[in-house]
A protein has these predicted regions:
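Intrinsically disordered, low-complexity regions enriched for glutamine and histidine
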Residues: 7-8, 54, 154
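Histidine-acidic metal/acid-base catalytic patches
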Residues: 16-19, 23-24, 32-43, 47-51, ...
Length: 220
């Protein structure tokens, strides 16, 4: 099940701020233009090169910041989905959307997941983000991964204590990995998106691969 695919990550920041899909077009036109243009350019490149683009549905803007530009979380989420619909229409099978710890595009709430399924998005599932949203509940993480399984095309396998964004090596956090084998889409690709002290040393990623391999071999 260990396939290969080139995945381009859209720019994470502009002027020191996260490149949020929900950026307000009126109050921050430069960031809005950057979001749209960079995403559209990468999608075109992915089509030309038969590769993939990963776009974060959101990052982690404080709710207070979101509500300074939108009347409610729901209205901001509708803007996010509208823009993701646009990127989906351009990219088709060359674009995917990753979950965040923001209520604008998170996995773990069945109602939001149902909405995501209705929009037929191709998904990247970051396990640490889902675990944090679910406050470290392993049974709910498994249920979420099972619910979205058929639409997931790429995984970020990352451990976490489930309290904040810690990006831990597998086996160093609180995620129970063994039961997750049955709810992972076997056709999806994956990476171990672990925080590295030295970007030129991938030992923690390789250790995570070995940990998951051993865990899933014993799960039958």
């Amino acid at each position: 099940r260990w396939g290969r695919q080139n995945v381009m990550h859209h720019p994470m920041k502009i002027n020191g701020q996260h490149n949020e899909v929900a950026v307000d077009r009126l109050s921050n036109p430069d960031a809005y233009h950057f979001l749209m243009q960079s995403s559209e350019n990468l999608i075109q490149l992915a089509i030309q090169t038969n590769t993939q683009v990963l776009i974060h549905g959101a990052y982690n803007s404080p709710v207070s910041d979101i509500l300074s530009n939108y009347p409610s979380i729901d209205s901001a989420r509708k803007v996010v989905f509208s823009r993701l619909d646009h990127f989906k229409s351009l990219g088709g099978d060359h674009v995917m959307f990753e979950n965040s710890i923001s209520p604008l595009f998170d996995y773990g709430d069945p109602e939001i997941e149902n909405l995501i399924i209705e929009h037929q998005y191709r998904l990247c599932y970051d396990t640490s983000h889902g675990f944090i949203v679910l406050h470290g509940d392993n049974s709910k993480l498994k249920a979420s991964m099972a619910h979205l399984r058929d639409q997931v095309v790429h995984y970020h396998f990352v451990d976490s204590m489930g309290q904040f964004h810690d990006s831990l090596e597998l086996g160093k956090g609180a995620i129970d990995w063994q039961p997750l084998k049955s709810v992972v889409n076997p056709d999806a690709t994956d990476i171990f998106e672990i925080n590295l002290k030295d970007q030129y040393k991938s030992n923690r990623m390789r250790a995570s691969y070995q940990y998951l391999k051993a865990s899933w071999q014993t799960s039958g």
